[in-house]
């Protein structure tokens, strides 16, 4: 019997004892991100003091007997977790507590992601791909990117896939079509209540969504704010933030990059340098992207903005710019 040689990727996951990581780790080890022909050298990191919880995560991963999980270590050393990695999933972040202003949250997480970026700069492979999940995600990603100048700025991504998935589902349900009939779902800007779920680009059964769903009032005043505020709605209903859906979205976001489908559009917060839409450089901004044969991505060019979308994009841009200014001295 001839054994097929597998490639191996070294992967770090932070916030390893949290809810999102708990769901994501099993998808990762199963092959949902890198495919069934790729073995994984997995490092799961969380803060000192969480060793016992990390050991429980390790037990469960071991007990799953995943064939693709070549090696596994749990650690409270960020340097150990990031040593020689090909990819990092930065999930851990400080949550917003009672009475905490957004500026306080930005400062606290700014310190966390400054450290993580600095460690990645020293320890990760130069071509490592970095996926940031911890909120406020665009600004956290920007901080990490700027603290890791030895890494390619184009390899930093902040997650907008959950917003894309939410919009995808709402459009499909409204049009009463299967999910795979909805394509070109685009989310611009910041992952916040000022994100821009752009229904004007979406297609339903190959036709513009605005033709299939002719009720513009529903698109602008029901669907649009529903996507913007979905995270808060989940917290209000469940008592906890999105976890399973966020983990699923993270796996899909990474898979779109590592195992792309021809012509697939995906929304991602990426470095805005030299973008085709006039967004200022040196931001992490949500754009529609697609993968190229070279393994790099491009921002999908030439998409028109109507007056409604253009105004909403400016609002989101203003928010990201203000967040950047508030942490730029970290």
Curated annotation (Swiss-Prot):
This is Malate dehydrogenase. Its EC number is 1.1.1.37. The keyword Transmembrane helix does not apply. It holds the Pfam family Ldh_1_N. The gene is mdh. GO terms for molecular function: L-malate dehydrogenase (NAD+) activity. Keywords: NAD, Oxidoreductase, Tricarboxylic acid cycle. Catalyzes the reversible oxidation of malate to oxaloacetate. It is an enzyme of class 1 (oxidoreductase). It comes from the Bacteria. It comes from Chlamydia caviae (strain ATCC VR-813 / DSM 19441 / 03DC25 / GPIC). Belongs to the LDH/MDH superfamily. MDH type 2 family. NCBIfam families: MalateDH-SF1, PRK05442.1. Gene3D superfamilies: Lactate dehydrogenase/glycoside hydrolase, family 4, C-terminal, NAD(P)-binding Rossmann-like Domain. NAD(+) binds at residues 15-21, 109, 116, 133-135. The active site is at 191 (proton acceptor). SUPFAM superfamilies: LDH C-terminal domain-like, NAD(P)-binding Rossmann-fold domains. Substrate binds at residues 96, 102, 135, 166. InterPro entries: L-lactate/malate_DH, Lactate/malate_DH_C, Lactate/malate_DH_N, Lactate_DH/Glyco_Ohase_4_C, Malate_DH_type2, NAD(P)-bd_dom_sf. GO terms for biological process: malate metabolic process; tricarboxylic acid cycle. The keyword Flavoprotein does not apply. It catalyses: (S)-malate + NAD(+) = oxaloacetate + NADH + H(+).
